[in-house]
Structure formats: structure tokens, C-alpha cells
Curated annotation (Swiss-Prot):
Family: Belongs to the actin family.
The UniProt record lists the keyword ATP-binding: yes
Subcellular location: Cytoplasm, Cytoskeleton
GO cellular component terms given for this protein: cytoplasm; cytoskeleton
Gene Ontology MF terms: ATP binding; hydrolase activity
Organism encoding this protein: Lumbricus rubellus (Humus earthworm)
Keywords, ordered alphabetically: ATP-binding, Cytoplasm, Cytoskeleton, Hydrolase, Nucleotide-binding
Keyword Nucleotide-binding: yes
Biological role stated in the UniProt entry: Actins are highly conserved proteins that are involved in various types of cell motility and are ubiquitously expressed in all eukaryotic cells.
Enzyme category, top tier: hydrolase
Name used for this protein in its record: Actin
EC number in record: 3.6.4.-
């Protein structure tokens, strides 16, 4: 019995592992780095490219590129390097021996799914593969088949209504505001405090500050008042060089931009309005089920206080008396991967794989018929 591989390629992090496991074995940055300078030491074995953590640790001498932008693959050569690294260095498996389940962003262009399929069968010789929509997997991981998923990662945020296991494409909304934008915004507002962060390497420090210290205020204006009148909300953070910085209202001003994108100079609706708009695009008969099953997934939904704030905002927009439930599972950072692990190990799923034989007969377009 061969174990399937599950690979969730996010804009910021790649999560990979084996079907049936309860967590991914490998989680590493979706980065490919290339040296900025010519190597001078002969025989040092300098590589022309580095992937993931190795690229991250050598970031001072590299130019870092993310092949996945806003959840969609934009650079296939680099993407191939990431998959190669996933199979051979992280999971240490021969890809030609295992079926592989890949994930894709909602509303992924058709040509992209075909390209993924082609690379798996032609470059890696996979025996079988499948492409699943990320938000649907998150819903499976929460034990549901109907609900609306607010999936927010590093590169993109989507609201995806799902009914009986099928995503409803006409009601899916995308918001190009996610973790990376919040990190950039935090860099900007820390600069106003007199701390300067500019390089790609320093951006990673700010990302860490964001992950450790930021939270969502239940009432933004009230929180701003508290922050102005006392130092109770201030926290300190030690930089790698030993310098200690203090951060106050930036802690909640940064993630507030999820609810008020105007902070970032964007005209779009916040995540609460986007979720509401997505529900309103659905058939009136299923809205009740969506309000009662609003599932959060992705790393950018990990801020403390986000579920309570979401509950408050949706309640104020929804019809009065509507039962509203925001589900924020503790493992939601990896719920897409976990859903993939569950799906790929179901006995009923085994007939869903696209086999190498089917691919050879029909070509890349087979993916549209078998994966939906």
C-alpha cells in the first residue's frame, strides 16, 4: 500500500507530508534565492540557486523570489525547483513511486492547473495526481461539507462558500490583502516610531514581530484610546543584534487593516464585508447554513481576537436573530494540508486520482474533468 504525498503550495510557505498524518512533515518558505555576487572561492561548491530555509538563512547574499504570487504560480521554473526540493530534500521520496495531491487557489486559471498536471507527470513521472481547491480542504479538516471558508494566507485572502462539498464559483471573492501586506504595513508604521526596516532580510524580522505580538482589537477606537492613555498595551521585542524595541498601538493597528483596507490605501471591503458579500451572492436558501458555519483558515487568521471581532462585525450586518458561528480551529494554520491528508487517505477517494495512463491518453486537460 503506497502512501500518497500531500503538498500545499502557499504564497509564503510550502506544507508537505504524507496522507494519513495529522500534520505536515515539512514546512518551509516558498522562496528561491540566487546569489547576488559572483563566487570568488573556487571549489566551494556554491550553488546557482537555493530553496526554502537554506535560501532564508543565506538571505544576506541572495536575491529572494517568491514563485507564487497572490496564491497563483507565476514562475514555473522556480516552482519546479520548489517541488524538486520538496520531494528529494524535505520528504526524501521518489516522486515516481507515490500519488501526489496538490492544492490550488480558488479561481486558479485553467492553464495553471494544466501546467501543474503536466509537470507532475512529465517532469516527476508521478503515477497519479489530483488538484484540490485549498478552501474546500480546510472545510473538510473542520469536519464539514457545507460552510463558508475565509482563507487568508501570506499572499491572498479568499471567501469561498461551499455547499455539500462543492465550491460555488460565482460567489467566491478574492481580496489581495494578506500576511505579506500586513508585514509591509507594520514595517511602515514602525518607521514612524523611528525604527527603520527596509531590506528583504529585515522584513523577515518584522514578520516575526507581527506573528508574536499583534492582535485584533474588538473595538478599534476604544483600543486606540487605551493605548494613548496608558502603557498597558506596550510590549518589547529584542532584535537579533540585541537592541530592544517597544511596540504599542502598532500591535493592533497592523491587523486592523484586514477590517479597514483603507489603512493600506486600498479601496476594497474588509474581510468581514467580503465574507458577508460572498454569502449574499449565494442562494437565499443556503445562507443560513453559511452564517452558522463560517470557518477560518490560513496563517493570517491566527491573530488573537480575530474570531470575536468577526462574530461582532458579521452579526451587525446579518439579519437580526440569525445564528452566526465563527469556527477558528487551533490548527487552522495547516488546515488546508490536514484536509488534503484526510481526503487522500479516504477509501472512497481512491478512484478520483488521475492516473499516468489517463494523462497519456487525454493530455493535461484531463484535470478539468477529474478535479472540480
Amino acid at each position: 500500500e503506497v502512501t500518497a504525498l500531500v503538498v500545499d503550495n502557499g504564497s509564503g510557505m510550502c506544507k508537505a507530508g504524507f496522507a494519513g498524518d495529522d500534520a505536515p512533515r515539512a514546512v518551509f518558505p516558498s522562496i528561491v534565492g540566487r546569489p547576488r555576487h559572483q563566487g570568488v572561492m573556487v571549489g566551494m561548491g556554491q550553488k546557482d540557486s537555493y530553496v526554502g530555509d537554506e535560501a532564508q538563512s543565506k538571505r544576506g547574499i541572495l536575491t529572494l523570489k517568491y514563485p507564487i504570487e497572490h496564491g497563483i504560480v507565476t514562475n514555473w521554473d522556480d516552482m519546479e525547483k520548489i517541488w524538486h526540493h520538496t520531494f528529494y530534500n524535505e520528504l526524501r521520496v521518489a516522486p515516481e513511486e507515490h500519488p501526489v495531491l496538490l492544492t490550488e487557489a480558488p479561481l486558479n486559471p485553467k492553464a495553471n492547473r494544466e501546467k501543474m498536471t503536466q509537470i507532475m507527470f512529465e517532469t516527476f513521472n508521478s503515477p497519479a495526481m489530483y488538484v484540490a481547491i485549498q478552501a474546500v480542504l480546510s472545510l473538510y479538516a473542520s469536519g464539514r461539507t457545507t460552510g463558508i471558508v475565509l482563507d487568508s494566507g501570506d499572499g491572498v485572502t479568499h471567501t469561498v462558500p461551499i455547499y455539500e462539498g462543492y465550491a460555488l464559483p460565482h460567489a467566491i471573492l478574492r481580496l489581495d490583502l494578506a500576511g505579506r501586506d500586513l508585514t509591509d504595513y507594520l514595517m511602515k508604521i514602525l518607521t514612524e516610531r523611528g525604527y527603520s526596516f527596509t531590506t528583504t532580510a529585515e522584513r523577515e524580522i518584522v514578520r516575526d514581530i507581527k506573528e508574536k505580538l499583534c492582535y485584533v482589537a474588538l473595538d478599534f477606537d476604544q483600543e486606540m484610546g487605551t493605548a494613548a492613555s496608558s502603557s498597558s498595551l506596550e510590549k518589547s521585542y529584542e532584535l537579533p543584534d540585541g537592541q530592544v524595541i517597544t511596540i504599542g498601538n502598532e500591535r493592533f493597528r497592523c491587523p486592523e487593516s484586514m477590517f479597514q483596507p483603507a489603512f493600506l490605501g486600498m479601496e476594497s471591503a474588509g474581510i468581514h464585508e467580503t465574507t458577508f458579500n460572498s454569502i449574499m451572492k449565494c442562494d437565499v436558501d443556503i445562507r443560513k447554513d453559511l452564517y452558522a458555519n463560517t470557518v477560518m483558515s490560513g496563517g493570517t487568521t491566527m491573530f488573537p481576537g480575530i474570531a470575536d471581532r468577526m462574530q461582532k462585525e458579521i452579526t451587525s450586518m446579518a439579519p437580526s436573530g440569525m445564528k452566526i458561528k465563527i469556527i477558528a480551529p487551533p490548527e487552522r494554520k495547516y488546515s488546508v494540508w490536514i484536509g488534503g491528508s484526510i481526503l487522500a487517505s479516504l477509501s472512497t477517494f481512491q478512484q478520483m486520482w488521475i492516473s499516468k495512463q489517463e494523462y497519456d491518453e487525454s493530455g493535461p486537460s484531463i484535470v478539468h474533468r477529474k478535479c472540480f
